[in-house]
C-alpha cells in the first residue's frame, strides 16, 4: 500500500453514489480509471490487507492521489469511464489500440446521388451502409457496384462543372447525369433504388424488378435494352451466389476471444442484412496479471462506447464470454442507439456457428501474432547484444525522400518491443533548405523531433540514421546542441549505409562519423530488425513524398502559362474536373470557363499539347 497516500482519510470523503475514479501516481499521471455503482464500496476494496491480484498490489503501491466524479446513473458512469480511458490511456487499464472509425458506403442525398466511401461523423445528408472491416473492402464493393449499377462516384465539384461526360461514361461505368440528355431522371433514380436495395441485402427484390423490366423490354421489341438488363441480372446473380447468407435480416456483431501468454486477441465478425461483410482482429494492450473477464469487458465497452468511434450499433452482439456487467452494457448501448440492443452469450443454431467461427479466427490470429512477437523479441535481443545495451524498448529510424530536390519529405518510424508502432509514425515536410541537401533535411527533422520535451517512455534507446557517415555526423551535431529537459545522451545514434548496389545484407553500421564501420552476417537476427525498420522508414518517406508530389502535379503544368494565376488555375481545374479533363478539352470548351478569354484559351490549349 502507498506510504504517501492517506487512504483512510480519503475514504471518509467518498460518497456511496455511482461514479468514476481516476488514480494518479507521484508524477501526476493517471495510471488507472474505473467506475463503480457504489464509489465508497469499490474504492475501499483497493485498500484491504488481502488484495485480489499482484496487478492490484502494484497499482495501489503507486497511488498518490485519487479524483472522483459522481454521476447520476451507472450508464453515465460507464460512458464517462471509457471516455477517460481514451483520453488518458492509463497503464493499468486494458487499452484498445486500434481506434480508427470503420468505413461505410455513403449514398448521397443529391438530385443525382453519388456513391462514396465515408469515415467519421455522419453529418452529410444521405444513407450509410456498413460498417465494413477496412477501406479495401469498401473500395472493392464500390468497384463492383460501378460495374453493375452505373451511378456516379465523382465528387460534387467535378460533377457540377462538367461540360461533357468523363471516361467512366465512355466505358459504361456511369450513366452521365452531369450532362443533360444522356440519361433520363427516371432511369437514374431506378438505378439508385437498385443500389439501395442491393446494399440493404434485398437482392431478391433487385432481381425481381430487373426481370420484370427485361420481359417488358422484350415485349416492346426493345431488344438492346432487354440485353443490357439481362447482363445486369447475370452480374447481380454472380455476386449473390458467392455470398454466405444467414437468416434474412440478421444485423449483428460476433465477438470471439483467445488468450495466451499474457496476450489477448478479440476477433469481431460483422454481419449486416444477413451477409458477412468481413472481420477484424484486435490485440488490446493488457497489463500483467489482468484476468480474461476484465479484458473482454473493457474491450467491448471501449469498442462501442468511446465517443469518436462513430460505430453503427447492430441489433445484437454475440459473445463467447459471460460478462458480469452484461445488462448494464446492453442498457447503455440501447440508450445510445435509441433502440433495444441485445447482448447474447449463449446462442444456438446459426448464431452458435458464427461464434465458433469468430473464436477460431481469434485463436488463429493470436498464434500468428505470438509467433511474430517471438521473432521480433529475438531480433531486438540480438541487436541489444550487438550494441551492448541491456534492452531495446523503443527504436526510431529516419529517412529522407525527394525528386531532384523537390517535395522533400522526412519520415520517422517507431518500433517498440512488439515491432512497428504505426500509430506513432510521423512525416515531416522539409522547407527552407537548398534543394537536394539531404544533410540539411536530416538536421531539420531531428531538431523538430527531439528539440522539445519528451515523455520518459517516448525516449528511444536507439536512433537509426539511414545514410551512413555524413548523416550520422549531422545527427551527432544536432544532439550536441540540444538544450532539452530529457536525457539526450540516452539514445544510441547508429548510422546505416547501404551496401554495394544497395543490396540487402551488405549494410555497414557506424557508431561514429569517423573511422571504419562494421557489418553483420546476412543471417543475423540483429541485421534483420535493422533492415525491417529501415525499410519501413524508407517506404513511409516514399509514400509521403508521392502524396506531396501528386498534390502539386495538377497545378505545376499550368503554373508555367503566362496569364494563368492561382484563381484562374483553380477555376480551370474545377470546371474541367481536373488536369486530365483540361488536357482533353478543345479551345472552345476552355474559353467557356469563367475568366478565360478566347486568346488565353488558345494559349492554354497549345501549352498543354506541347
Curated annotation (Swiss-Prot):
Concerning SMART domains, the annotation shows: GIYc (SM00465), HhH1 (SM00278)
UniProt xrefs under InterPro entries: GIY-YIG_endonuc, GIY-YIG_endonuc_sf, GIY-YIG_UvrC_Cho, Hlx-hairpin-Hlx_DNA-bd_motif, RuvA_2-like, UVR_dom, UVR_dom_sf, UvrABC_protein_C
* Domain GIY-YIG as annotated: residue spans: 16-94
Domain spans labelled UVR: 204-239
- Where, subcellularly, is it found? Cytoplasm
Biological process (GO), any one: nucleotide-excision repair
Can you provide one Gene Ontology molecular function annotated for this UniProt record?
excinuclease ABC activity
What keywords are assigned to this protein? Answer: Cytoplasm, DNA damage, DNA excision, DNA repair, Excision nuclease, SOS response
User: Domain of life of the organism in this record?
Assistant: Bacteria
On whether DNA damage is a keyword of this UniProt record, the answer is yes
* Cellular component GO terms, alphabetical: cytoplasm; excinuclease repair complex
| Sequence similarity | Belongs to the UvrC family.
Which purpose does this protein serve, as stated in its record?
Answer: The UvrABC repair system catalyzes the recognition and processing of DNA lesions. UvrC both incises the 5' and 3' sides of the lesion. The N-terminal half is responsible for the 3' incision and the C-terminal half is responsible for the 5' incision.
For this protein, the record's NCBIfam families field holds: PRK00558.1-5, uvrC
- Known partners and oligomeric status: Interacts with UvrB in an incision complex.
What protein does this entry describe? UvrABC system protein C
* Native organism: Salmonella typhimurium (strain LT2 / SGSC1412 / ATCC 700720)
State the organism's lineage: Bacteria, Pseudomonadati, Pseudomonadota, Gammaproteobacteria, Enterobacterales
What's the encoding gene here? uvrC
Amino acid at each position: 500500500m502507498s506510504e504517501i497516500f492517506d487512504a483512510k482519510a480519503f475514504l471518509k470523503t467518498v460518497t456511496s453514489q455511482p461514479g468514476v475514479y481516476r488514480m494518479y501516481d507521484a508524477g501526476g499521471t493517471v495510471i488507472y480509471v474505473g467506475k463503480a455503482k457504489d464509489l465508497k464500496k469499490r474504492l475501499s476494496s483497493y485498500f484491504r490487507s488481502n488484495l485480489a491480484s499482484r496487478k492490484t498490489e502494484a497499482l495501489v503501491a503507486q497511488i498518490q492521489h485519487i479524483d472522483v466524479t459522481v454521476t447520476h446513473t451507472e450508464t453515465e458512469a460507464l460512458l464517462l469511464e471509457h471516455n477517460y480511458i481514451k483520453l488518458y490511456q492509463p497503464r493499468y487499464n486494458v487499452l484498445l489500440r486500434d481506434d480508427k472509425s470503420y468505413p461505410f458506403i455513403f449514398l448521397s442525398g443529391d438530385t443525382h446521388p453519388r456513391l462514396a466511401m465515408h469515415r467519421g461523423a455522419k453529418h452529410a445528408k444521405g444513407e450509410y451502409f456498413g460498417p465494413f472491416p477496412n477501406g479495401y473492402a469498401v473500395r472493392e464493393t464500390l468497384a463492383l457496384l460501378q460495374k453493375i449499377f452505373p451511378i456516379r462516384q465523382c465528387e460534387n465539384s467535378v460533377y457540377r462543372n462538367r461540360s461533357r461526360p468523363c471516361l467512366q461514361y465512355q466505358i459504361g461505368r456511369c450513366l452521365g447525369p452531369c450532362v443533360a440528355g444522356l440519361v433520363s431522371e427516371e432511369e437514374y433514380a431506378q438505378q439508385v433504388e437498385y443500389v439501395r436495395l442491393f446494399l440493404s441485402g434485398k437482392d431478391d427484390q433487385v432481381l425481381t424488378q430487373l426481370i420484370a423490366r427485361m420481359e417488358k423490354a422484350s415485349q416492346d421489341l426493345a431488344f438492346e435494352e432487354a440485353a443490357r438488363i439481362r447482363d445486369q441480372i447475370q452480374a447481380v446473380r454472380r455476386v449473390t451466389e458467392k455470398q454466405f447468407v444467414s437468416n434474412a435480416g440478421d444485423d449483428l456483431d460476433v465477438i470471439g476471444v483467445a488468450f495466451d501468454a499474457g496476450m489477448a486477441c478479440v476477433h469481431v465478425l460483422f454481419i449486416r442484412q444477413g451477409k458477412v461483410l468481413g472481420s477484424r482482429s484486435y490485440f488490446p494492450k493488457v497489463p500483467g496479471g489482468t484476468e480474461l473477464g476484465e479484458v473482454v469487458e473493457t474491450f467491448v465497452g471501449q469498442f462501442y462506447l468511446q465517443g469518436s468511434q462513430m460505430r453503427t450499433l447492430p441489433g445484437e452482439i454475440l459473445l463467447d464470454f459471460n460478462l458480469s456487467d452484461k445488462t448494464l452494457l446492453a442498457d447503455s448501448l440501447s440508450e445510445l442507439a435509441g433502440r433495444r440492443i441485445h447482448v447474447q452469450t449463449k446462442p444456438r443454431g446459426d448464431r452458435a456457428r458464427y461464434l465458433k467461427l469468430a473464436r477460431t479466427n481469434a485463436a488463429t490470429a493470436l498464434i500468428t501474432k505470438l509467433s511474430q512477437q517471438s521473432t521480433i523479441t529475438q531480433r531486438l535481443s540480438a541487436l541489444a547484444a550487438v550494441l551492448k545495451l541491456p534492452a531495446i524498448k523503443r527504436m526510431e529510424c529516419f529517412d529522407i525522400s525527394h525528386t531532384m530536390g523537390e517535395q522533400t519529405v522526412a519520415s520517422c518510424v517507431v518500433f517498440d518491443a512488439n515491432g512497428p508502432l504505426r500509430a506513432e509514425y510521423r512525416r515531416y515536410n522539409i522547407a527552407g533548405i537548398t534543394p537536394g541537401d539531404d544533410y540539411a533535411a536530416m538536421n531539420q527533422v531531428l531538431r523538430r523531433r527531439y528539440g522539445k520535451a519528451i515523455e520518459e517512455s517516448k525516449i528511444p534507446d536507439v536512433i537509426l540514421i539511414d545514410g551512413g557517415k555524413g548523416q550520422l555526423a549531422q545527427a551527432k551535431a544536432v544532439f550536441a546542441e540540444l538544450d532539452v529537459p530529457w536525457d539526450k545522451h540516452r539514445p544510441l545514434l547508429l548510422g546505416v549505409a547501404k551496401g554495394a548496389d544497395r543490396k540487402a545484407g551488405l549494410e555497414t553500421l557506424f557508431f561514429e562519423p569517423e573511422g571504419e564501420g562494421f557489418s553483420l552476417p546476412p543471417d543475423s537476427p540483429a541485421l534483420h530488425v535493422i533492415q525491417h525498420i529501415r525499410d519501413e522508414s524508407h517506404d513511409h518517406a516514399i509514400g509521403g513524398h508521392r502524396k506531396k508530389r501528386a498534390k502539386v502535379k495538377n497545378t505545376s503544368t499550368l503554373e508555367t502559362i503566362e496569364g494563368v494565376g492561382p484563381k484562374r488555375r483553380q477555376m480551370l481545374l474545377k470546371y474541367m474536373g481536373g488536369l486530365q479533363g483540361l488536357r482533353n478539352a478543345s479551345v472552345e470548351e476552355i474559353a467557356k470557363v469563367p475568366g478565360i478569354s478566347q486568346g488565353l484559351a488558345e494559349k492554354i490549349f497549345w501549352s498543354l499539347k506541347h
